[in-house]
């Protein structure tokens, strides 16, 4: 379904990262698999650009991996990746996630070119960036050796699942490092029910009309923006772009003239209220400034009215 040589259902994306790392460190060698996380004598370093460090990259450390950072916060030069790759390098990590790829860092294509020229596999985490459905295929097609995708986010399969797809030899190695084998991935077991549930969800997901889906999300976001009306100091818009907001979002920008509570204060109040409303907020959660962003993917019909009501309650609270 994904156009990959092979694939494996994992116990979520984080478990998929563990198996990615284990496959690149120990391969399919039984003696090495049994030794993890002792990586003595094995390639175990994973090169990653500084802006691509993320909350789950500790998963690479579980089987004994070590992350090697390159670049600055908003810039990476090709020579930095070239110089970082050495005898201990097991892989190059590339994160596809909102607000993590400023224009000055190495692109996916550049990472693939440099890493592959030195015999190093490229590992891609695209867990939170599906839809668009194209992301299921693009990175495998364009050079990734392994790609991890969440089964429970946009695909809407079991929340405890993920998909690890890529080169046949690396998927075989990941499988040998996983349950039911007595290996580093034994604790991250997937049941037959989860596997069937994810495969079924993926089939349904691929059969959906993405254009119509995006239009629904856009309409929901437009309804939220319209419902807010004119709040002095707040600029509400619908945004979508191919990098940072791949789905339509209703975004509230706090203008310099705004004199009310901060975006963070509004976010916390929304989460603590009745009903609980969870929104994205500010740069620490993937954003530009002190804005609030609302993703429509998990909303049911009628939820937008509740969101508008709660937003207005908190924005006008004095």
Label each PLM-derived region with a short phrase.
Residues 3-206, 210, 220, 225-229, ...:
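Conserved PLP-enzyme active-site core in the AAT-like
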Residues 213-217:
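Shared catalytic-loop signature of beta/alpha-barrel
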Residues 227-316:
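Conserved C-terminal alpha-helix-loop-beta "cap" of PLP-dependent enzymes
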């Amino acid at each position: 379904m994904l156009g990959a040589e092979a694939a494996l259902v994992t116990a979520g994306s984080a478990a998929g990262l563990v198996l990615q790392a284990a496959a690149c460190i120990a391969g399919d060698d039984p003696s090495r698999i049994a030794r993890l996380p002792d990586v003595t004598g094995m390639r175990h370093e994973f090169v990653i650009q500084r802006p691509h460090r993320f909350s789950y990259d500790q998963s690479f450390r579980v089987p004994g991996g070590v992350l090697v950072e390159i670049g600055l916060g908003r810039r990476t030069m090709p020579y930095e990746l070239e110089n970082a790759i050495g005898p201990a390098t097991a892989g190059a990590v590339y994160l596809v996630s909102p607000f993590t790829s400023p224009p000055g860092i190495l692109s996916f294509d550049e990472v693939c070119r440099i890493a592959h020229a030195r015999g190093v596999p490229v590992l891609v985490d695209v867990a939170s960036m599906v839809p668009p459905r194209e992301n299921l295929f693009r990175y495998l097609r364009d050079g990734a050796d392994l790609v991890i995708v969440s089964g429970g986010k946009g695909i809407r399969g079991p929340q405890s699942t993920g998909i690890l797809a890529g080169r046949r030899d690396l998927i075989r190695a990941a499988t040998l490092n996983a349950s039911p084998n007595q290996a580093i991935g034994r604790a991250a077991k997937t049941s037959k029910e989860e596997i069937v549930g994810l495969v079924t969800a993926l089939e349904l997901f691929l059969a959906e009309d993405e254009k119509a889906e995006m239009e629904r999300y856009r309409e929901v976001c437009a309804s939220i923006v319209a419902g807010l009306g004119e709040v002095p100091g707040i600029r509400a818009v619908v945004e979508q772009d191919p990098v940072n907001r791949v789905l339509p979002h209703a975004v509230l920008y706090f203008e310099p003239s705004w004199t009310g509570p901060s975006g963070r204060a509004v976010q916390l109040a929304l989460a603590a209220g009745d009903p609980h409303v969870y929104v994205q907020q500010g740069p620490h959660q993937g954003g530009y400034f002190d804005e609030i962003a609302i993703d429509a993917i998990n909303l049911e019909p009628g939820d937008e009215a509740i969101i508008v009501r709660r937003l207005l309650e908190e924005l006008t609270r004095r």
